[in-house]
Amino acid sequence: EIVIIAIPTKAVADLPRALFVSVPSSVVVIDIGNYHPELRDGRIDAIDRGMLDSQWVAQQIGRPVIKAFNNIFAKSLLEKGVSRGTKGRIALSVAGDSSDAKAAVLGLVDDLGFDPVDGGDLDNSWRQQPGTPAYCRDLEAAPLRRALAEADRSRIAEYRAEREAQIRRDIASRHDESDKR
């Protein structure tokens, strides 16, 4: 069994503290969220001081999480899954500390039509966060592994700020296009 947390990061703190108390430890929890302090979430001090967003989520819910599906656009997830072995198959990275839980999520990624890539432990989940070379680029497995390796941890805040600026530009562009209609 798998539970997916798919809410804004700021809302995780508002979940009932006992939400997962009666959920068996064998149930895998996937965090698919991304922290956007300027666009949506406001500032979360622990994350701004260096805690990774998925580590913060795990702390808030009192349960380990696997980071996955945060580095693909919904449209790609919906439309671009293909059979194993298909040339050009998009890869998705999965990061987490439990090898069993991670294996379950890697299998889910494959079942959904994407090449699963082990992104390391949760401490390495920053490599697939907004703005990094691996974020939302619809890469195949080998290029995704290279992109994960190329990420520079000292640039996390810069990566995030660049991505948020791009989102703002995209929103403004869509707004301008709708005004022309």
What are these regions (language model features)?
Residues 6-7, 48, 96:
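Conserved residues at beta->alpha junctions
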Residues 21, 59, 107-110:
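Solvent-exposed polar/charged
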Residues 15-19, 41-42, 79-80, 106-107:
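Short amphipathic alpha-helical segments
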Residues 25-28, 32-83, 101:
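Rossmann-fold NAD(P)-binding glycine/threonine-rich loop
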Residues 2, 64, 115:
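Residue-level detector of anion-binding/catalytic polar loops
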Residues 8-11, 72, 98-99:
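Short beta->alpha connector loops
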Residues 87-181:
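Active-site-lining helix/loop region of Rossmann-like oxidoreductase modules
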Residues 1-30, 34-40:
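Rossmann-like NAD(P)-binding element
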